A protein has these predicted regions:
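ATP-dependent adenylation/nucleotidyltransferase module used to activate substrates
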Residues: 1-153
Length: 153
């Protein structure tokens, strides 16, 4: 078994092991946080391959590229699209500042509130940042599975 096949098998096994918890938390099973990017697309397909119960949700930011929205609607029509209560422009007016690297308030309002009370699947990679690398595959406090492809071999 090659490295990629091993990572896929590991991820599928982890999804299957945690499915009981996901179903206890929600009758829909996992809440898959979907962005249309390569990581969430890969995680979507891993969940399909695992045969686990999940529902994919995308939090629309109002600044998503039209090409991305067309891609999601055409290739992933089962993804539930959620519009924010307040759009990014109103949020900037309310905060009286643009989001910057040290003050990233926008995701807390537009994306991170989704999936509360569920086991949420996040397609993130350790290589993206030291903070993401420090995350565990399963975070019980938030009931989040990171979809890690970085397990020991």
């Amino acid at each position: 078994m090659g490295a990629l096949e091993h990572k896929i098998a590991y991820s599928i096994a982890l999804l299957r092991r945690a499915e009981t918890l996901a179903l206890r938390m929600s009758p829909d099973g996992y809440h898959l946080a979907f962005s249309g990017g390569k990581d969430s697309v890969a995680l979507y397909h891993l969940a399909k391959m695992a045969g686990v119960k999940f529902k994919a949700h995308m939090q629309i930011t109002n600044i998503d590229p039209p090409e991305l929205m067309r891609f999601v609607r055409s290739q992933y029509p089962d993804v539930v699209l959620h519009r924010p209560e307040i759009n990014i422009y109103k949020l900037i007016e309310k905060k009286k500042m643009l989001p910057i690297r040290t003050k990233r308030y926008c995701c807390a309002y537009l994306k991170e509130q989704a999936g509360g009370g569920t086991v949420t699947l996040l397609g993130i990679r350790a290589a993206e940042s030291p903070r993401r690398a420090a995350r565990n595959e399963v975070q019980i406090g938030n009931h989040r599975f990171s979809g890690s492809f970085d397990q020991p071999q």
